[in-house]
Design a protein with these regions (language model features):
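C-terminal-most transmembrane helix of multi-pass membrane proteins
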Residues: 2-5, 207, 243-292
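Juxtamembrane helix-entry segments on the extracytoplasmic side of multipass membrane proteins
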Residues: 11-15, 39-43, 47, 68-73, ...
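Hydrophobic alpha-helical transmembrane segments of multi-pass membrane transport proteins
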Residues: 21-32, 60, 77-92, 135-136, ...
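Juxtamembrane helix-loop-helix junctions in multi-pass membrane proteins
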Residues: 22-53, 101, 161-186, 204
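Hydrophobic/aromatic residues within transmembrane alpha-helices
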Residues: 36, 45, 49, 93, ...
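Specific alpha-helical transmembrane segments that line the substrate/conduction pathway
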Residues: 44-55, 83, 87-119, 155, ...
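Hydrophobic transmembrane alpha-helices of multi-pass small-molecule transport proteins
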Residues: 57, 108, 122-141, 252, ...
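Transmembrane alpha-helical segments that form core, pore/gating elements
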Residues: 57, 113-114, 130-132, 141-198, ...
Length: 292
């Protein structure tokens, strides 16, 4: 193995490690924040997560934005708006349906972007497999809240956009300055949801501490790790790793929230994950053949 190949392999392994770490921290933080929902609700919880996370990131990075280009600002604005909508929808979803089911449905967003990018018969088969997975997860009698499912689909649309926006911010800014600005924009957009709950946080330091932990885990460490992973990985490899997010969510929901995992849930999860891995792998093979 040449030195260049070894460097690339090391870079890929580090990127994969960052992606797995980011997914675990984000889903773990979702399990923690669910216990705050009965007190201040999912919308306010999301808003405080962005506000506290942005404050921590700004304090740590102190981004110098005076010399930012228009392209950098557009990227940060796009990422901030995207994660604001995505997380609001996601928190509304997990307040109504199990964490694993919500993430599996949400994953259809980036999956469809990859699948419909190339309309080959194989890709259509993978779309059918993913569709079967969603039917298994949301089948009549499964007890899933319809509004929660719709919010999960909304979060999926946000996730699809997030992939492009985060890649752009990671490619046009250095360090975590771009992430800090993006999260500040998200905090500003969701600020109205947090205003009415300020008194409760003042009265309950424990609640404020829990939200701070969630903010650090999800935004500072989770999003930060994903950003580092996306900087190091090819889109095809990143796509395969993202397909594992629903499995991580089901595991976290089962271990930390004691959410039941039924046979149909496992079948649905397997269909969605296999479809995601398949469509990503097929795309990467097609790109390699075209390059030769």
């Amino acid at each position: 193995m040449s030195q260049t190949q070894a460097t690339l392999d090391d870079r890929t392994l580090r990127g994969a490690g960052f992606m797995l770490l980011g997914a675990t921290l984000i889903q773990w933080s979702a399990a923690i924040v669910e216990r705050v929902f009965p007190v201040i609700g999912p919308s306010a919880s999301s808003a405080w997560r962005f506000l506290l996370g942005a404050v921590v990131l700004l304090a740590l990075t102190r981004p110098n934005v005076r010399h930012w280009t228009k392209r950098q600002w557009i990227g940060a604005l796009a990422l901030g708006a995207t994660v604001a909508v995505m997380n609001q929808c996601f928190y509304q979803a997990i307040a109504r349906i199990p964490l694993g089911s919500a993430v599996a449905i949400e994953y259809l967003g980036p999956f469809c972007v990859a699948a419909f990018g190339k309309r080959s018969p194989k890709h259509l088969a993978f779309v059918g497999l993913a569709g079967a997975g969603v039917v298994a997860l949301t089948r009549p009698g499964n007890g899933l809240n319809v509004i929660g499912v719709l919010f999960a689909f909304g979060a999926g649309l946000g996730w699809a956009t997030y992939i492009f926006a985060s890649k752009r911010v990671g490619g046009t800014t250095k360090g975590f300055g771009g992430l800090a600005v993006s999260m500040s924009i998200a905090a500003t957009l969701t600020l109205p949801f947090s205003i009415g709950t300020s008194a409760r946080l003042v009265e309950s330091p424990e609640l404020l501490l829990r939200l701070l932990i969630v903010a650090v885990m999800a935004i500072v460490l989770g999003f930060g790790a994903e950003l580092q992973g996306l900087r190091r990985l090819k889109p095809s490899i990143a796509g395969v790793l993202l397909a594992g997010d629903p499995a991580v969510a089901f595991l976290v929901g089962w271990l930390l929230l004691h959410q039941a995992v039924r046979l149909w849930d496992i079948v649905g999860l397997a269909c969605v994950v296999l479809a995601g891995v398949g469509v990503t792998y097929d795309s990467s093979v097609s790109e390699s053949e075209l390059a030769q």
